[in-house]
Amino acid sequence: MTYSIFDREQLVIGGLNERKNKVIFERDMVSLLQKPHAFSQEGTHLIERTVERIRVAKEKKSSVMLTFGAHTIKNCMAPVLIALMKEGWVTHLATNGAGIIHDWEIAFQGQTSEDVRANVERGQFGIWEEPGFYINLAIIVGAYENLGYGESVGKMIANEGLKIPEISTLYDTTTQYMESDPDKAAAAIDLAGTIKRFGLKAGWMPIPHPYKKYSVQYQAYESDIPFTGHPMFGHDIIYTHPMNHGAAIGRTALNDFLRYAASVVNLEDGVYMSVGSAVMSPMIFEKSLSMAQNLKIKEGKHIDNHYILIVDLAESDWDWQQNGEPPMDHPAYYLRYCKTFHRMGGEIHYLSADNRDFLLALYRQLKGEK
């Protein structure tokens, strides 16, 4: 059968300088000195329990993983995320494709978050040159360099540019590795095709990022701490640009998934915090934990003493730790993220909170402040 394929080459692509943004980082950023709103007694206890478990994990060199949705970046939480990472409280950060983009836009222009309703109406939502061109190109180059999704973008921000190889070098690489390393050969020919298609010049492509100090990806890259990106096809604005390359996204995202899974392997006595991620976090966690258990069982071990805290705005009156999984006729059963994580063993808790309040309270208590 013949199906129609949308031609992105026909799109009229705007520049970011034409776009109004709702979030201005230096105006809206959350300071480390800012105090969170007060929590209930139960909420305070959960944060104290989480702090206690993080301290144990740090002492035992177990993973402390923080996985979050894009709103954590849009809410200008970078100062807190960077502090948690740089002060050694968190060993792995993970977000979705939108989180990667919002962080990059902040590094590139100091602002992010367009008006979706207005821009869809005028046929312009997500159809912007700079994020579409630079992020996709960073991922294509990163795939050739065998990097992860988040690492590819973090490296571009850190270096404020990309190295574009000679196309003849890429052809040679393709020929050399076609049999011994087909993946490397394929990534090389993909990059060569991109260079030819867009008429890119070999050498250094400068891409200034004047606000990079606010980028979590940049700070993670510089600190050699995993910041993994877990995108889904068609979910993010970079898919509207002709530079977008599915194979490169697949290669880099797979690298990041396997890096994420490697951190889950080290989760015995560790901590997993899922903040504002209803789909991505529980879905990649359950597969990763299953793989990790598979390896541990081969060694005669098992991951049992892990701690999971789920944080989201939705209210839930169900005690997952005490009552187990609710029946199918209870609304809590359809809180997919709670249900999935509850099936993962260990100690699990749910906290209804704004991510700003939770992360601030967590950081302050880790620092010994109230």
Locate each region found by the language model.
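A general structural motif
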Residues: 43-48, 208-209, 231, 246-265
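N-terminal glycine-/serine-/threonine-rich phosphate-binding loop
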Residues: 2-82, 90
